[in-house]
C-alpha cells in the first residue's frame, strides 16, 4: 500500500512530473504516528491529531483533488509550524483513490483500522458516499467531504460535517437565476454516476420548490468522457433555453463544444465541481459566456480577510490560486477551529469534544466567509456565487 506524506512546500503539485513523483513515493519519508500518538485522550501538550484523506491524485478528477489537497495542506503546515492549534498538531495521511468509489471505501476502512481521529476531505459524490457506508459501524467523524450526496446531510447523520453547500443548494441557486432571466425551458446534462444523478434530482426538486415548469429534457453521458453525441442530439430536440450541467470538465467541454456546433445558442450553467481552471484548459476561448456556481470566495477577492490570509501563505509556495485550493484551505481552517474550541472547552481534544465543537459552528465567521457545518436544506444558498467566464478565462459576477 502506498502512503503519501506531503511535506515539501516548495514544489508545484500541479505539474505532471511532480504528480508522478508523488504517486511513486519518491518525495519525503513516511513518518506516521502510531496509535499511541493519537489525540483520543489526555491533555494537549505534545499531542497530535491524525486525519485520513482519500483523494483523486490520478484519474478523472486529479486536478480537483490535487488543488484541494494543496490548499488544506498549506493551512495545516502553517499552524503546525507554530506549535499547532492550542498545542495540538494536525497530521494528514493521504491515499490516492483515482476517483474510484471502491478505492475510496477501501482507503476509508484502512484509515479507520489504523486509528485515525477523523476522515477528512474525501472528494467525489460516489467516493464520499461509499467511504461513509464502509465505515458506518465505527462512525468516525467525517469532515468536509467534497461533493458528498445530499443524503449525507440528513439530520440523523451526526458524524458528518459539511463545509461546502450541497447539490440541492447549488441547484436552487442556478434554477432561481434562470427564473430571473425568464428561462423556464430548462434541461440537464449530467454524468451517469452518483454526482450526476444526484445533481439531476436536485435540479428537478428545485424547479418544484420554486414552482417552475418541470425539466424539458435530460441526458446522461459516461463520466468525464467526450462521448456526448447522443446527449447532444437528445437535448437539441427539446430546444431548451438553458442547459444545466452536472459533470466534470472533459464531459462539460465536449458537450458545450458539440452542442454549439449543432446550432445551440442558449445558456450553459455548471455546478461548481466542474472546476474553472480544468474547464478553461479543455475549452479555451470557447468557455466564454458559460456560467458556473462557486461555493467559496474567489481568489481575486483580495479585500476579504480570509483570501488575503490565503494569498499570503500561497505566496510562500509554488502553488497556483484556485477555487478548489481555497476550498481545501477553508476545510482545514474550519477543522482547526473545531480543535481550538474543543481544547478551550475541555482542555483536551477527543472525538466527543471535536463533535461538540463542530456542532457549535453553525455560523462561524472565517475572515468574512460564513461556515455552517450543519446547514439545513437551502440555508447555504446565500454563500454561493454565480459567475460568468469570459473567453480569456476571467471571472465576472
Residue ranges and their predicted role:
Residues 315-325, 336-396:
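Segments of small-molecule ligand-sensing domains
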Residues 49-71, 95-101, 123, 189-197, ...:
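Extracytoplasmic "Venus flytrap"
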Amino acid at each position: 500500500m502506498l502512503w503519501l506524506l506531503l511535506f515539501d512546500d516548495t514544489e508545484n503539485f500541479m505539474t505532471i512530473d511532480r504528480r508522478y513523483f508523488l504517486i511513486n513515493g519518491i518525495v519525503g519519508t513516511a513518518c506516521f504516528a502510531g496509535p499511541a500518538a493519537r489525540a483520543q485522550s489526555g491533555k494537549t501538550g505534545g499531542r497530535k491529531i491524525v486525519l485520513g484523506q482519500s483523494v483523486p491524485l490520478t484519474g478523472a478528477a486529479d486536478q480537483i483533488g490535487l488543488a484541494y489537497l494543496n490548499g488544506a495542506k498549506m493551512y495545516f503546515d502553517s499552524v503546525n509550524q507554530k506549535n499547532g492549534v492550542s498545542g495540538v498538531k494536525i497530521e494528514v495521511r493521504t491515499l490516492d483513490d483515482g476517483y474510484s468509489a471502491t478505492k475510496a471505501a477501501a482507503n476509508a476502512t484502512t484509515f479507520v483500522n489504523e486509528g485515525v481521529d477523523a476522515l477528512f476531505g474525501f472528494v467525489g459524490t460516489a467516493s464520499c458516499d461509499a467511504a461513509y457506508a464502509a465505515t458506518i459501524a465505527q462512525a468516525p467523524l467525517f469532515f468536509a467531504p467534497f461533493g458528498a450526496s445530499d443524503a449525507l446531510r440528513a439530520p440523523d447523520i451526526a458524524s458528518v460535517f459539511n463545509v461546502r453547500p450541497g447539490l440541492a443548494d447549488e441547484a436552487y441557486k442556478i434554477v432561481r437565476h434562470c427564473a430571473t432571466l425568464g428561462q423556464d425551458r430548462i434541461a440537464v446534462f449530467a454524468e451517469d454516476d452518483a454526482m450526476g444523478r444526484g445533481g439531476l434530482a436536485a435540479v428537478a426538486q428545485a424547479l418544484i420548490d420554486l414552482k417552475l415548469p418541470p425539466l424539458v429534457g435530460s441526458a446522461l453521458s459516461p463520466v468525464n468522457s467526450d462521448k456526448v453525441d447522443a446527449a447532444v442530439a437528445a437535448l437539441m430536440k427539446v430546444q431548451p433555453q438553458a442547459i444545466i450541467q452536472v459533470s466534470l470538465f472533459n464531459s462539460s467541454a465536449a458537450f458545450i463544444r458539440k452542442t454549439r456546433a449543432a446550432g445551440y445558442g442558449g445558456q450553459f450553467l455548471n455546478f461548481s465541481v466542474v472546476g474553472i481552471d480544468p474547464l478553461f484548459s479543455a475549452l479555451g476561448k470557447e468557455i466564454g459566456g458559460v456560467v458556473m456556481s462557486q461555493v467559496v470566495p474567489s481568489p481575486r477577492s483580495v479585500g476579504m480577510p480570509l483570501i488575503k490570509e490565503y494569498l499570503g501563505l500561497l505566496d510562500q509556495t509554488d502553488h497556483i490560486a484556485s477555487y478548489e485550493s481555497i476550498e481545501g484551505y477553508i476545510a482545514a481552517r474550519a477543522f482547526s477551529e473545531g480543535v481550538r474550541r474543543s481544547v478551550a472547552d475541555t482542555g483536551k481534544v477527543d472525538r466527543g469534544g471535536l463533535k461538540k465543537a463542530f456542532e457549535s459552528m453553525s455560523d462561524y465567521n472565517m475572515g468574512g466567509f460564513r461556515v455552517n457545518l450543519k446547514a439545513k436544506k437551502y440555508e447555504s444558498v446565500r454563500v454561493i456565487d454565480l459567475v460568468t467566464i469570459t473567453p480569456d478565462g476571467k471571472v465576472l459576477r
